[in-house]
Amino acid sequence: FRACYRLWLSYRLAIFPIGVVMELYEVMRTTFAARDFVDELVSDEALARILDNARFAPSGGNRQGWKVIVVRDDATRARLGELIEPGFQRYAAQVQAGEAPWNTINASAVSDETVAATKLPRGFVDKLTGAPVVLLVFVDLSVVASFDSGLDRIGVISGGSIYPFAWNILLAARNEGLGGTLTTFVGAQEPVLQELLGVPSHYAFAAMIPMGKPVKQLTKLSRKPVSEFAVLERFDGAPLVD
């Protein structure tokens, strides 16, 4: 038994150094959308550890079509902020009108004039682009399966081959004492973003992840209970739990 334990321990420590291993459920329940960061560098070594573990996310056919661009350059950050603002402005205007923003089911009644007049929260965009490091995540559409491509609605299935990876990045960052948030505001300007970063047209933007050490680590998040979303056998079935 001792020999087996020593073998297991040596394997565990080879992957996760002492002092940085968190319990899985704790990581899942305390990884929050961090947007306020201390002025502290995120090293390339920390990023490499994060991505080295995030890469074990599943993807369709194990094709692993992700590409991550690490942005630190101030000029690029500034341009990202400019690209974020139009989409975020429309988002904010629709939220203020009580709508689900950028929704493909319920058409927006918010006019372009109202959108243009909507003021953005002070400093919000700067928090995203001014994080210690910004990751841009893209997915190669030439390798993902899109089983819903023929349906008369927005496609979502391709996301199954990229968002587990993006979420793994945030989970791994939490384990490193870091944090971030998955944002998609800049996606509305994808062609310009592709040109800015030299991204081929068949790579779709999936997420922008500002990352750093949070000013405050939240440990108690609010989410719906299981009884509100898990049912038995049918959409209108009985709750899985009371």
Listing of model-derived features with the role each one plays in the protein:
Residues 63-65, 128-132, 204:
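Short connector loops at helix/strand junctions that flank enzyme active sites
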Residues 50, 54, 133-196:
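Small-aliphatic-rich amphipathic alpha-helix that forms the alpha element of a beta-alpha
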Residues 1-21:
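Short, Lys/Arg-enriched N-terminal segments with co-localized hydrophobic residues
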